[in-house]
Amino acid sequence: MFENVIGDWPKHERFIITSCDDRYFNQYFPRFYKTFNEHWQLPIHVHVIDPKNESLKKLQYLKLSHTFCYTDSNILKWPYSFETYCQAQRFIVLGHHMLEGQSVIVADVDCYALRKPTKQQQDILESD
């Protein structure tokens, strides 16, 4: 499964990761990307499940890192839904690829940043 993840893992010490299928990428990721870039100013990594060619082209123009994969039908034979599979991907990919010393914020793709992090949040972001 993990050998089929295409793309480069980010080398940043701190970044935000999210994952989604192609539908959620087009529906929610533009707002996610815009607001987190504007308010949090941390690198963003997105993992896209079953992306269409149009989505892959969009990714090339954005200032971020990305990986993607295509669903192996054998995985969906487990007693899990496709939605569960999609929801778990960011944690699975992160657990498999995270480098020593990386500090990663895991976020839902349908969330967005309303404002800059508070001082307390910023201190947490900068601590290690």
Where does each model-flagged region fall?
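A short, glycine-/small-residue-rich helix N-cap motif at loop->alpha-helix starts
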Residues: 25, 78-89
